[in-house]
């Protein structure tokens, strides 16, 4: 939740800095654009009275808009405000991405082992015999029987009596032992 709030604050600060840098025109404008000056189409000649009677439908304060556009000074404080906004956004971002004290400290009781290192203690799979007359038979799954012979695990196919050793990911036979 803290990260979400901080991210939204960073986003808001960044957007305000961008809009301020563009001169307060907002984020959606994609550059310094000016209205295209077009050449008016030739109009048929009108009489003097018709020209005087024609007025625009609405002005929508065009005079006020032109005055405010020319009166906006380039304030040198905008650079300072943009810098302060960027610094605040960077600080918030570093606070969000930095680990907490509990995450940064790892237990150093035991040295770390590489991922491919063999464990010190090898575990031996222990099975209970399924049949007292055949103590090596320790399991069955569908068409295959599982046997523990001489401390190694073997699979035997029931249909063609094909035997295969069960190995681990390093092609070593899996050790096993049988209990009664």
Curated annotation (Swiss-Prot):
Residues 1-21 form the signal peptide. Residues 23-81 are annotated as: Disordered. Residues 27-78 have a biased composition (Low complexity). It comes from the Bacteria. Keywords: Signal. This is Uncharacterized protein PM1449.
């Amino acid at each position: 939740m803290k990260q979400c709030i901080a991210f939204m604050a960073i986003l808001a600060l960044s957007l305000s800095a961008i809009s301020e840098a563009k001169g307060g025109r907002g984020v959606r404008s994609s550059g310094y654009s000016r209205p295209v000056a077009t050449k008016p189409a030739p109009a048929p000649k009108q009489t003097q009275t018709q020209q005087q009677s024609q007025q625009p439908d609405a002005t929508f304060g065009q005079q006020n808009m032109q005055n405010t556009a020319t009166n906006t000074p380039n304030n040198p404080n905008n650079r300072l405000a943009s810098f302060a906004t960027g610094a605040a956004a960077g600080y918030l971002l570093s606070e969000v991405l930095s680990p907490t004290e509990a995450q940064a400290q790892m237990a150093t009781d035991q040295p770390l082992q590489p991922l491919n290192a063999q464990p010190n203690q090898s575990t031996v799979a222990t099975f209970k015999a399924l049949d007292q007359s055949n103590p090596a038979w320790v399991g069955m799954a569908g068409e295959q029987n599982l046997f523990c012979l001489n401390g190694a695990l073997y699979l035997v196919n029931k249909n063609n009596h094909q035997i295969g050793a069960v190995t681990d990911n390093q092609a070593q036979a899996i050790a096993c032992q049988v209990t009664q």
